[in-house]
């Protein structure tokens, strides 16, 4: 079990490293009847904002309603879920009839995925008759209207002096032997982030019987310079063992490091060595998936072996020259303009709706996977299938693949995706669009191949599927119910072909 969850504070008195913010939050709660204002908790990730909010709820005996980034946060959802909770109390014995509404990542409400959400939150904090806590990393990413109608409390980065006692307590709780210097090194490396220090401690503790300073990467490191030097070592110079040892000096988790390597590897590798390297990256990705599923961080070791030693071993000798390495294109796009965030959120919403996963899973797991599989549209057939499945326009395909949206390549892919959707709507809808029934009929309906019309605006691609399926069902109801052998064989072949080329949800 993840130690950050296992040992999450249950009362405010257990929250470490932000005494001033903790006291201010307690005062806000105790005087809420006097001011009736929402409060914004803001600061860097991993420093205890969400934990403090839940600990406060326990102290005040307030039931909680939480809406986070993994949920759809449109105007309707906010009004239905958070709105009802914020305007009505509870009949439970404790807490004075109050309930606490917690909205995580309140600074990350953008675009189609959360349409109207920001305005709905602003209206809600003005009208709420129950206490509300908004949690944000970037205070000024929220609108002026929202900030002006809330109190605010800043959570500062946690100092190493406050982190060390927490790590010491965890070691005692888990029966881990340790050297004091090792805990100090961990705290300094994660200065500012208590959650990161705890995760690092768990990862190391699960791979050794006694935690020593040698187990901890020493020295303060510059992440950007370190990663570029490391890429030079792995992709050009080092053998397998040296590449593995070099990874210990890079301030990146395996989840992040694999993206750096994958995005820059094709700049130095080609042909069979690139194929071999991708096989090692695939193995590493499987081990990382097991970490996410089991929370067993000892599997990080095997992921690291594959993505570092394996990738280095796949190379045919050393390489010279200078290479312009860069951050993973998928990451770099995430921090750009609001328009890019809108594009990202549309893609995430489509994935979430069609694959039946949360927005968080769509953003953090499936989108990076798609970006890798369709990088620069090299696998054209798969890219067309992706665009058809998730109803993508040129800007969406460009965002995921890293190719320019105005290029002929992307435009042709979008056109082929439209043709694939039209064909699926006429012949069958079980392949490209999972869950829809076959669109039958008497052969005369939709003979021109046009897809059924959908409402403009907020209707997404999955609504298009529903309409196509409904039309087919209605047509079936009016037909004579007979089907020829040729028609059955054709439909079967089409479904089989479609399963092979566009069943993204299946193989994911």
UniProtKB/Swiss-Prot annotation:
The set of disulfide-linked cysteines is none
- Where is the region Disordered? 425-508
- Biased-composition ranges for Acidic residues? 443-461, 483-500
What CDD domains does the entry give?
AAA, HLD_clamp_RFC
Offer one example of a GO biological process linked to this entry: DNA replication
Q: Does the keyword ATP-binding apply?
A: yes
Question: From what superkingdom does this record's organism come?
Answer: Archaea
Q: Which UniProt keywords apply?
A: ATP-binding, DNA replication, Nucleotide-binding
Q: What one GO molecular function would you report for this record?
A: DNA clamp loader activity
Binding-site positions, ATP: 43-50
Instruction: Report the InterPro entries cross-referenced here.
Output: AAA+_ATPase, ATPase_AAA_core, P-loop_NTPase, Rep_factor-C_lsu, RFC_lid
Assembly and oligomerization: Heteromultimer composed of small subunits (RfcS) and large subunits (RfcL).
Function of this protein?
Part of the RFC clamp loader complex which loads the PCNA sliding clamp onto DNA.
What family is it from? Belongs to the activator 1 small subunits family. RfcL subfamily.
- Quote the HAMAP family the UniProt record gives: RfcL
Which protein are we looking at? Replication factor C large subunit
Gene source species: Haloarcula marismortui (strain ATCC 43049 / DSM 3752 / JCM 8966 / VKM B-1809) (Halobacterium marismortui)
């Amino acid at each position: 079990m993840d130690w950050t969850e296992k040992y999450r504070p249950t009362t405010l008195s257990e929250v470490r490293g932000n005494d001033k913010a903790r006291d201010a939050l307690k005062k806000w709660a105790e005087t809420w009847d006097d001011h009736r204002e929402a409060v914004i908790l803001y600061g860097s990730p991993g420093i205890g904002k969400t934990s403090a909010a839940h600990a406060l709820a326990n102290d005040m005996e307030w039931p909680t309603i939480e809406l986070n980034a993994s949920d759809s946060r449109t105007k309707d959802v906010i009004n239905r879920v958070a709105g009802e909770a914020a305007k009505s109390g509870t009949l439970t014995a404790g807490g004075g009839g109050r309930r606490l509404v917690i909205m995580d990542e309140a600074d990350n409400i953008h675009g189609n995925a959360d349409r109207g959400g920001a305005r709905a939150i602003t209206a809600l904090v003005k009208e709420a008759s129950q206490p509300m806590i908004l949690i944000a990393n970037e205070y000024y990413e929220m609108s002026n209207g929202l900030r002006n109608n809330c109190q605010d409390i800043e959570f500062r980065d946690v100092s190493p002096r406050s982190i060390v006692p927490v790590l010491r307590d965890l070691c005692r709780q888990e029966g881990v032997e340790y050297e004091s210097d090792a805990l100090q090194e961990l705290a300094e490396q994660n200065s500012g982030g208590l959650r990161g220090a705890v995760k690092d401690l768990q990862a190391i503790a699960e791979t050794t019987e006694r935690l020593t300073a040698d187990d901890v990467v020493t020295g303060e490191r510059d992440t950007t310079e370190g990663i570029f030097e490391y890429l030079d070592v792995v992709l050009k110079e080092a053998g397998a063992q040296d590449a593995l040892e070099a990874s210990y000096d890079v301030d990146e988790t395996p989840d992040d490091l694999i993206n750096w390597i994958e995005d820059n590897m094709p700049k130095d590798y080609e042909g069979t060595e690139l194929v071999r390297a991708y096989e090692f990256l695939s193995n590493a990705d499987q081990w990382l998936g097991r970490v996410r599923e089991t929370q067993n961080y000892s599997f990080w070791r095997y992921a690291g072996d594959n993505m570092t030693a394996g990738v280095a071993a796949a190379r045919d000798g050393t390489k010279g020259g200078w290479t312009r390495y860069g951050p993973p294109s998928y990451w770099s796009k995430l921090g750009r303009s609001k328009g890019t965030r809108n594009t990202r959120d549309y893609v995430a919403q489509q994935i979430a709706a069609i694959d039946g996963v949360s927005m968080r899973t769509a953003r953090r797991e499936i989108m990076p996977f798609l970006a890798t599989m369709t990088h620069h549209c090299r696998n054209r057939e798969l890219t067309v299938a992706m665009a058809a499945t998730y109803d993508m326009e040129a800007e969406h395909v460009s965002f995921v693949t890293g190719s320019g949206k105005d290029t002929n390549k992307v435009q042709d892919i979008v056109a082929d995706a439209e043709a694939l959707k039209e064909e699926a709507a006429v012949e069958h809808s079980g392949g490209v669009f999972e869950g829809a029934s076959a669109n039958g009929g008497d052969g005369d309906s939709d003979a021109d191949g046009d897809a059924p019309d959908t409402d403009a605006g907020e209707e997404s691609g999955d609504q298009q599927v529903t309409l196509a399926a409904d039309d087919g069902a209605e047509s079936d109801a009016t037909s004579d119910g007979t089907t020829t052998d040729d028609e059955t064989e054709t439909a079967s072949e089409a479904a089989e072909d479609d399963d092979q080329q566009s069943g993204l949800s299946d193989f994911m």
